[in-house]
Each structure stands twice: as structure tokens, then as C-alpha cells.
């Protein structure tokens, strides 16, 4: 930081403040994680100096010979990790990865997609009216059964037969249960549609077999690399070789220019890390931790959407507590516990307020915490939510959070 501190002390100070926030607190946002020092080093490298429009062996600029090797390593490692036929590592984000699939197989203003409603667990880029996807395509959305709070595959099939979409999107940002990707592809096949699985949240779990993988099951698989994969912020697309050329064309020149080669290098590093046996142990622990935390919260009387979790996240319904998600998020934040407000099935509040909280275990698991610590964290959450106006309790919990965090380095030896 010495160069930055000299050149721009304001930015250096703010980065240090954020470092201390992460060090001293507990990161329980389900979409966040910690990258390794190796990934950080790759992302901060001189690769950021170079333009590399195009693909390996077909660049529009000279001097890309090392960039070609880096991108090929990233692609090959991703294919090995997921046993994929074709991989594109250039998307700047998961949303752009999704956009590339849509652009490849749908006609703007004409074709229809079918996807999970945002309020019931989906994602903005899956056809929300405020997203490009909802503005450019016709959209029909499915949800969960309001009694079980699970995806009703029969209802999905019934809707598909009625609306006849060009693409069926599966995958979610706030669904705590296992997704049956094979069932979605079979439904898509029955109506002549493509199926796209967005595994941004569960990619690390899918890569290690902790959650069933959609790769080679559905037509297209998209993901981010920064959640359970524990890599840099970015996106990827995997598909069968028959779709590879049109996907690559949709990314470049379709919607992006030069790839972010420093980020692609970071992706390559994270894919290598995910291929190690220790990463499978990590993925298993993420789920064990989520289930341990869910057990503690549920036993204390908090209502868990669907009754628990099969993956890395927990969705809490605060309706019966007289709290909003926003109020709970703010109170827990004061105690050093970072979570996010989230809509729940049958939501009746604004997405800026919500009736729910989303909690995840990837980041605290990366710090080395296990089930015992999850029970402890669950108790912290319960104490704060019991009375969010009790500043003395919030202060006491914050001190305990800091003490717990101090025992688990932000960068343990495994990172």
C-alpha cells in the first residue's frame, strides 16, 4: 500500500478502513467470500496494462502471446473443473454471461423467457422488469409453492406448456434448497426450449459434487466466479461444443471489447485452487456450517423459509417478529455482523425494506470457522434480533464478534 498511500492517501485510508471492517466483523452475505492472496496478486498485476480484444490465437492487437496462454489456462482449468466441453471466461459479470446466452438464442422484442420471480428467489437478470432482460424480452415467471416454499416442478411444466418460452432459466439468488436441473432440462425439451442454469451462488458446490451440477445436463450454464468459487468478480459460460461459437461471438464482439486479463488471470488461479482436494472439504464445510447455523436459528423460534437449507444460504422470514429485513440488517451491522435484507415468498414489503434476511456461510468458512462457531454466531443473531433497540446488547455482541473474528485470520494459511 506504500505507493497508493503516497499517491492517494484518501483512497488508501478508505481501503484500510474496509480491511479493518472485514477483519473485525463477520461477513454473512451469501454472495460474498474471500479470495486468496494469489488471486489478489494476479488481479493487481501488470496484465491490466494490455488490450487483448478477441480470443487466443485470434487477437486484434499484437503482443498478446502471454495473454493467450493465460486465457487458455483459465478455459482449460474451468473445463476440467466442471467437465465442460466449451468454456468462455471473458464475461465481466454473471449478468453479462446471462445476457450472452439470451442474445445467442432469443430475438429481442419477440421471444419469451421463463424464469424464477425475483421476489421468490430469482435474480434481476432473469427477466425482472427493471433489468435489460425484462425490457428486451417477453417474460413469464414461476415461483415456489407457498406452502412448502419449494420449486413446484409440475407447476413449472404446466406454465412452460402454456407460454411456450424460447428459454427456461433455472438457478436463483435466494433459494436455500437443491435444484433439480435435469427436471428443468426435461421440461425445456418437452416444449422445444433451451434451458440455461445460472449457478452463480452454488458454483463451488457444483464443482465439487456437493450440489448436483447442471453442466452437460442443461444447454447452457452461467456463473459468477466470486461467490462459492472463491475467485475474482467476474462471469463464465459453459456449454456443449455445438453452442460454443455463438456464445463466444455473443461476448465478443457482441457485447464486450477487450477482456479484463488481470481478472481472467485471477479466474485461472481460482480454478486451480478449486481443483485441489482441500476445496472439496471447504465446500462440504460451507454446507455443514449453513445447516448448523440454521439449526440454531430455527431452535430459537426464527422461521426459516422452506424449513432449512441444502446449500450455503439461509432465508429468514421476520414477519412474525414484528421486524423488517432492513431493521434487522442495520441492527446486526451495528454488532459487526454483515447480512442483507431480502424478499421472501409471498412478500408484501418493498425490496428496499423486505420481510426477510439472507444469511450465508462462504466467507466465515473461508476463515476456518466450523459448526461450533456457527452455533455461537447464531446466538449473537438471536440476541440482537430479540430487541434491536437494546444498544447495550448490540455493543456487547459487537465486542464478542470482534473477539471471535480475532481468532480467525482474514487470510489463514489455506488462503
Swiss-Prot record:
InterPro entries per record: PyrdxlP-dep_Trfase, PyrdxlP-dep_Trfase_major, PyrdxlP-dep_Trfase_small, Ser_HO-MeTrfase, Ser_HO-MeTrfase-like, SHMT-like_dom
Keyword Cytoplasm belongs to the record: yes
Disulfide bonds: none
Keywords on record: Amino-acid biosynthesis, Cytoplasm, One-carbon metabolism, Pyridoxal phosphate, Transferase
Gene Ontology BP terms: glycine biosynthetic process from serine; tetrahydrofolate interconversion
Pathway annotation: One-carbon metabolism; tetrahydrofolate interconversion; Amino-acid biosynthesis; glycine biosynthesis; glycine from L-serine: step 1/1
Catalytic activity: (6R)-5,10-methylene-5,6,7,8-tetrahydrofolate + glycine + H2O = (6S)-5,6,7,8-tetrahydrofolate + L-serine
Pfam family, one: SHMT
Function of the molecule: Catalyzes the reversible interconversion of serine and glycine with tetrahydrofolate (THF) serving as the one-carbon carrier. Also exhibits THF-independent aldolase activity toward beta-hydroxyamino acids, producing glycine and aldehydes, via a retro-aldol mechanism.
Protein name as it appears in the record: Serine hydroxymethyltransferase
Organism encoding this protein: Methanosphaerula palustris (strain ATCC BAA-1556 / DSM 19958 / E1-9c)
Taxon lineage: Archaea, Methanobacteriati, Methanobacteriota, Stenosarchaea group, Methanomicrobia
